[in-house]
Amino acid sequence: MAEEGHRAVEAIVMVAEAPVEPGLLAQLLELPVERVEEICSELALSYEAEDRGFQLQRVAGGYRFASHPDLAAYVERFVLEGQSTRLSSAA
């Protein structure tokens, strides 16, 4: 069963528009920054071990979710087809 800190990090990062800095996560969760870093590392490793379609990445001094690189062709197809569908509907 996932610890509340793990679930909270997931929930916050999921809704964030930009990478979330560990210091902000620590403040929101009322945990030391070191513990937040551990939680993020544990989450990233568990997603990789479970061969998930997404990753928790450290970028621009913060954390964000991103699709797994080996699924780029599917994501690209979704983005391109989604764009043409939206354009066709608007016309």
What annotation goes with each model-predicted range?
Residues 15-21:
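Short capping segments at the starts of secondary-structure elements
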Residues 32-42:
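Short amphipathic alpha-helical interaction segments
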Residues 1, 71-83:
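Short, Lys/Arg-enriched N-terminal segment that forms or immediately precedes the first helix
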Residues 20, 31, 85-87:
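Alpha-helical hairpin
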Residues 5-10, 88-91:
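Short, leucine-enriched amphipathic alpha-helices that occur as contiguous helical runs
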Residues 12-13, 25:
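Hydrophobic structural patches
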Residues 22-28:
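A short acidic, leucine-rich amphipathic alpha-helix
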Residues 43-72:
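Charged low-complexity interaction tracts in eukaryotic proteins
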